[in-house]
Structure formats: C-alpha cells, structure tokens
Amino acid sequence: MRKQYWFIILTYIIMQFSALIAIPLLFKFGYAGGQPTDENMLHAQGLWSVISFIACLVVVLLILRTVPKETLRNGQKDSIGLSILWAIAGFFIALFSQGIAGSIEYYVFGIGRESENTQAILDVIQAVPLMIIVSSIVGPILEEIIFRKIIFGALYEKTNFFFAGLISSVIFGIVHADLKHLLLYTAMGFTFAFLYARTKRIWVPIFAHLMMNTFVVIMQLEPVRNYLEQQSTQMQLIIGGLFL
C-alpha cells in the first residue's frame, strides 16, 4: 500500500477521535457559556463534526493529488456514460441489498430495524442542520475513499473480490459502531465494492453512497415521515371506500 494511503487512513482515524479532545476544549473556552448540558453537547458534537469532517476531506484530497493516477488492477475504466448508469443503478442496488440484509436481521436473528447510528445522526441533524452536509456528502466521499479505494483496492490487488470485499465491508461496519447491524453494513459495503470493481471509477460508489444516505436521512426527517403517514392513511381510506 502506498505511504500516502497510510497518511490518509491516519488522518481519518485522528478525525474520528478528535471530538474526545475538541468538544471538552470548546466548553472550556466558553462555548455555550461553558455549560455541557445534553442539548449543548448535541450542538457541540454537530458543530465539531462539520468542522472536522470537512477539514479531513480537504487534507485527504490534497494527499490524493500526490498519488499517481492508476486504475484498479490497472484495468480499463468503463465509459463515462456507462459509469453514470451504474452510479444511478447502484443507488437502487444499495437500497435493495440494505432491504435484504435488514430482513435477514429481523426475521432470522430477531434484530430490530432501528439503527442507533442512524438515529444518533438524525438527532444531531435536528440540532445542527448543517450536519446533513456531513451525513449526505462529506461522509460518503471519505468512506468510499478509505474503505473502497484504499482498503478494498489494496486487498483486491493481492487477493480476490470476495475476500477484499468482505474484509473492507466488515471494517466499514465496525467503524459505524452499530455492531448489531453489521450484516447490513457489510451488504452495503459489498455493493459499493462491486460498483468500484465493475467501473474502476471511485466516483461511482461515491455517488450511489451519497444518494442512499441522502434518501435515508430525508425519509427519516419528521416532516417527511408525517407527510408519508398522512398520504398512506388517505390511500387506505380510498382503497377501503372502493369496497363499501
């Protein structure tokens, strides 16, 4: 693995743990009047997430500029047009694989569909709306660079698709700190790895991941959920009226 990739991984790790030091310092220097209440902590977490993720992405992109351009296994990239089709299809494939994995977790292992990681992110978004930039744009870009381009790519050069996909996807799931849904994250990781291996273009899984995260966040926002529930109720009344 190139030394630049190790620097990128180290940058990502530092970013992930930086809140342990940064948030207490924010309060020490007077943020929110120095009062670490639950509400203020949520705001601080959101604020620092936005700052740290964007800073991390800038550093990662600058480091990537020093890496010689090469394709996965030196293979031929798919055409731009075909790659766009795969990026769009990848969004639906990711949703499908997520649904299958979620159903297996629920019906086979008795694991609830609620995700603590997703709910925690939604709570922060409610407190700091700018956080949606992290969950829907910056986060997916960083994760695809780390877990697909670097980890999957390095393993795929030495092994096969299944082994590289499995290891990188399991690590992807563990990092999300929601181990009961490890199967779900692994399924999504395999989907994004397939898109990268198929097209040889990292922006393809980035786009699919970005669209999926955006879709999930939008569908979980309270105004949207209320609207969908209202439409569902009206549809049931209409269907019920047809049989009266």
From Swiss-Prot:
Localization: Cell membrane
Pfam families: Rce1-like
InterPro entries listed in its UniProt record: CAAX_protease, Rce1/LyrA-like_dom
Leader sequence residues: none
MF (Gene Ontology): endopeptidase activity
UniProt keyword list: Cell membrane, Hydrolase, Membrane, Protease, Transmembrane, Transmembrane helix
GO biological process assignments: CAAX-box protein maturation; proteolysis
Parts of the chain that traverse the membrane: 7-27, 44-64, 80-100, 127-147, 159-179, 202-222
Cellular component, GO, one term: plasma membrane
Active site per the UniProt annotation: 143, 176
Membrane topology: Multi-pass membrane protein
EC number(s) given by UniProt: 3.4.-.-
Record-marked site positions (Transition state stabilizer): 209, 213
Catalytic EC class: hydrolase
Protein family according to the UniProt entry: Belongs to the peptidase U48 family.
Role according to the record: May function as endopeptidase which proteolytically removes the C-terminal three residues of farnesylated peptides containing the CAAX motif where C is cysteine, A is an aliphatic amino acid and X is any amino acid.
Name the record gives this protein: Putative membrane peptidase YdiL
Gene label: ydiL
